[in-house]
């Protein structure tokens, strides 16, 4: 049973709760980004690799590359702004939760990604990418709040190891779904069964991410409110980036 008492900074419980978000979200980077979704996407367009978009025929691989690049542009632009707003409001947990829910539900929505829903599927892929990387920004910003400087390397390593273990476990399960669909009661032709199993793997990623992140959210603090003038909220994050850049220049 979870205790309502919030653990103190530097405590093993709080550091483990923070690191456990790696267990929750790393399945996205392994299953969606690396292993299964690229195979599903390629198989989807094996007969016709062209996507009609805004009056142009675009190759499917180029389309996903453009969409990924555009998502990273959006993330790089909004992240400092969101960081400034979160610092002003003192509630970065809410921002992190928003992007976790955005990403996880978008992954679940990929279940319906097929040739009849190309644009919806690509949009969900885009939202999942935004949710994943934006949530990591707030997740990483929590490290100084949960661990003292001498603990931070160990805490990061713990998160990395948990993420590796968790993502491999789910990947192995998803691969078993795809390779042995009959064992799990998935019917149809071999190709239909594999396609359906891949879709189920996207749902598994979304649910895994959504459910296990709740452990981190239960224990993580709300966030400390920083004293920032309202007129400086929007550009506060950019100013912090500049100060980091100046510090790097000074030391290197």
Question: Where are the model-predicted features located?
Answer:
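Hydrophobic core of transmembrane alpha-helices in multi-pass small-molecule transporters
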Residues: 100-138
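Glycine-rich segments within core transmembrane alpha-helices of 12-TM secondary carriers
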Residues: 156-179
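Helix-loop boundary and gating motifs at the non-cytosolic
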Residues: 5-72, 118-122
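Juxtamembrane intracellular "pre-TM" segments in multi-pass secondary transporters
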Residues: 2-16, 221-252
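Cytoplasmic membrane-interface "Motif A"-like loop-to-helix N-cap segments
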Residues: 86-102
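Cytoplasmic helix-loop-helix junction between adjacent transmembrane helices
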Residues: 124, 130-161
């Amino acid at each position: 049973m979870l205790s309502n008492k919030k653990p103190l900074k530097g405590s093993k419980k709080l550091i483990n709760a923070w690191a456990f978000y790696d267990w929750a979200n790393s399945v996205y980077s392994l299953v969606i980004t690396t292993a299964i979704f690229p195979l599903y996407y390629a198989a989807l367009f094996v007969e016709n690799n062209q996507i009609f978009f805004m009056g142009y025929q675009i190759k499917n691989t180029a389309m996903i590359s453009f969409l990924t690049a555009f998502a990273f542009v959006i993330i790089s632009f909004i992240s400092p702004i969101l960081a400034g707003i979160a610092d002003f409001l003192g509630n970065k947990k809410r921002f992190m939760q928003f992007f976790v829910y955005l990403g996880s539900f978008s992954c679940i929505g990929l279940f319906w990604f097929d040739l009849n829903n190309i644009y919806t599927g690509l949009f969900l892929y885009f939202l999942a990418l935004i949710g994943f990387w934006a949530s990591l920004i707030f997740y990483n910003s929590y490290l100084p709040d949960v661990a003292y400087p001498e603990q931070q390397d160990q805490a990061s390593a713990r998160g990395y190891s948990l993420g590796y273990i968790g993502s491999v476990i789910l990947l192995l399960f998803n691969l078993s779904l795809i390779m042995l669909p009959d064992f799990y009661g998935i019917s149809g032709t071999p190709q239909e069964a594999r396609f359906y199993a891949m879709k189920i793997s996207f749902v598994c990623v979304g649910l895994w991410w959504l459910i296990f992140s709740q452990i981190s959210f239960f224990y993580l603090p709300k966030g400390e409110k920083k004293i920032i003038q309202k007129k400086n909220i929007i550009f506060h994050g950019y100013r912090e980036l500049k100060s980091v850049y100046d510090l790097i220049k000074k030391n290197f």
